[in-house]
Regions:
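Walker B catalytic acidic pair
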Residues: 69
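Active-site-proximal or metal-binding-adjacent scaffold patches in catalytic folds
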Residues: 1-64, 73-102
Length: 102
């Protein structure tokens, strides 16, 4: 429960940029242990799942993952249009993503 509260607070910082797209309804947030990714967005279920392990990453990297997953509500893939959406909110997204590789 502590981890979900933590990621909910982080998500609340990003949500206003997507409120219109989401019709004013926040997505369901889940947290679980994952080994192959930091987060997963399921637009059809209006759900984002964050990796429990993300909690131990730097805050700048955490925000990157939150923004990344929210951007999947706009673009379902990792096309140039998707990365353009990420860049609108986080011009330094590449540096933030690198933090996750350390």
């Amino acid at each position: 429960m502590l981890f979900r509260s933590y990621f909910t607070a982080m998500s609340d910082k990003v949500y206003p940029a997507f409120a219109g797209v989401l019709g004013g309804q926040k997505p369901v947030l889940k947290v679980r242990s994952m080994t192959s990714c930091w987060g997963v967005c399921c637009p059809a279920k209006r759900q984002i799942t964050f990796a429990l392990q993300l909690y131990n990453q730097p805050p700048a990297a955490q925000i990157y993952v939150v923004v990344h997953e929210y951007c999947h509500f706009l673009q379902l893939n990792h096309s140039p249009a998707f990365w353009a959406e990420v860049e609108k909110l986080l011009p330094d997204w590449k540096a933030r993503r690198e933090l996750l590789k350390k």
